[in-house]
Design a protein with these regions (language model features):
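Acidic/polar loop patches that form or flank catalytic/metal-binding clefts of enzymes
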Residues: 1-2, 18-19, 295-301
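A cross-family structural signal marking well-folded subdomains
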Residues: 2-228, 324-327, 344-345, 376-390
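Short Fe-S-cluster ligation motifs
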Residues: 116, 317-337
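Secondary-structure transition/capping motifs at alpha-helix termini
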Residues: 135-139, 157, 242-245, 296, ...
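Betabetaalpha-Me/HNH-type nuclease active-site subdomain
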Residues: 185-323, 350-353, 358, 365
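Acidic, carboxylate-rich catalytic segments that either coordinate divalent cations
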Residues: 332-390
Length: 391
């Protein structure tokens, strides 16, 4: 299809402009090649981001050339082939930036970085990134944050990828028309928030049931990193915590509180030893821990591990053993106020912490609907003071 598109461009371009066409085409191929992107996937998502398609008939890679021939005037191929190619090249350059967690200006964007960690080889969200690349930098960053939250909800609730593609392609038309903060807010509310509302129950259930064997390990690390990062942000309100890099570094490990390789004494002491392996991999049994501490706490029982958890710089991990306090009513105190501390580690504790993290996740990924504090097991609503970190 790429060669056919190139031929089509030559057919529509006057001979005196062939040198410009050749130069731009080479730049396009080189740009996609440099970031290892498949040209056909790029073209397919380019079309989805820029043109309205029949939602009942998905655009396949085999259909791309036919689409361009049938829609050559709409795409700009007929009247301004070089302008069309320039737009294509701009999108390829943006695509390369997105893959490097950068916005169209080349600035690092933490939400794009998070999407890179979360998405693996998936690229469906690039449809929306291309459709929104015209937005001012601050608004584009807000769009990226909203995409991250939505994309994660799709992943955790096991939404089929064809749903991502269909939704993102349909929504692109409205996103292309959003030019400022007000329009973007309305777009996010109409498309993202309304979609998330329908998935809220599934999101909560997925977190209550989440365990290592249900999700790829790089995504479990992302989840633990986001939960840990959120508490740090609430406590310190410091831009140093904006990046997930420090939470997913090789110096940080996923710690199993109930140990992976227990001594016989540890396994026998567990209250549901016949279900040890099931509880071992639950989200509630996992936390991030610095490697230097992890080697010292290793496979012992909980009471022996507690001093190690107290040494952690991560408040979510440290709060297993204690709630750090500084002065009276400080931001740090409020950040850890609703985390639960555990005297012993059994099946009930793991289930309790899993529920706590599930309630925390609603804040972390900004899910719409009713919210409860992480330590609140009752159905009452809460105010949002803790969430915003206001004085």
């Amino acid at each position: 299809a790429m060669d056919l598109l190139k031929n089509l461009l030559f057919m529509k371009t006057s001979p005196d402009e062939y040198p410009t066409l050749k130069h731009r085409w080479k730049d396009l191929i080189d740009t996609l090649g440099a970031c290892g992107e498949k040209p056909l996937r790029f073209l397919r998502y380019f079309i989805m981001a820029h043109f309205e398609l029949d939602s009942k008939k998905p655009l396949r890679e085999d259909d791309i050339y036919d689409w361009f021939t049938k829609n050559s005037k709409l795409a700009g191929l007929e009247d301004q082939p070089l302008v069309f190619l320039k737009t294509l090249l701009e999108c390829a350059t943006s695509w390369r930036n997105f893959l490097s967690a950068k916005d169209v200006t080349g600035a690092i964007n933490p939400y794009l970085k998070n999407l890179t960690l979360l998405s693996g080889a998936a690229r469906q969200h690039f449809i929306l990134l291309l459709a929104g690349r015209h937005l001012p930098q601050q608004e584009f960053s807000r769009l990226c944050r909203a995409i991250e939250n939505l994309f994660f909800c799709y992943i955790i609730t096991r939404e089929p990828t064809r749903t991502f593609e269909r939704n993102f392609a349909i929504w692109s038309a409205d996103l292309r028309n959003a030019k400022d903060e007000t329009a973007l807010n309305q777009f996010v509310k109409d498309k993202f928030t309304s979609d998330l509302e329908k998935r809220r129950a599934a999101f909560d259930f997925a977190f209550q049931e989440l365990k290592q064997s249900r999700i790829q390990q790089y995504r479990m690390r992302y989840i633990l990193a986001k939960l840990t990062q959120y508490i740090e942000q609430q406590a310190w309100n410091n831009s140093a915590h904006d990046s997930l890099d420090q939470f997913i570094a090789s110096t940080v490990e996923v710690e199993h509180i109930l140990p992976q390789n227990p001594t016989n004494l540890v396994k026998e002491a567990f209250d549901k030893k016949e279900r040890y392996n099931e509880y071992l991999e639950k989200l509630g049994n996992l936390t991030l821990l610095e490697k230097t501490i992890n080697t010292s706490v290793s496979n012992d029982h909980y009471q022996k591990k507690v001093p190690g958890y107290r040494q952690s710089s991560y408040l979510l991990t440290r709060s297993l053993a204690e709630k750090p306090k500084v002065g009276l009513n400080t931001q740090l105190n409020r950040a850890v106020e609703h985390l639960i501390t555990f005297d012993q580690w059994n099946s009930e504790a793991i289930e309790c912490r899993q529920g706590m993290l599930a309630r925390l996740a609603v804040f972390v990924w900004d899910m719409p609907g009713k919210r409860k504090m992480p330590d609140d097991t009752t159905p009452e609503l809460i105010n949002s003071e803790w969430e915003t970190g206001d004085e």
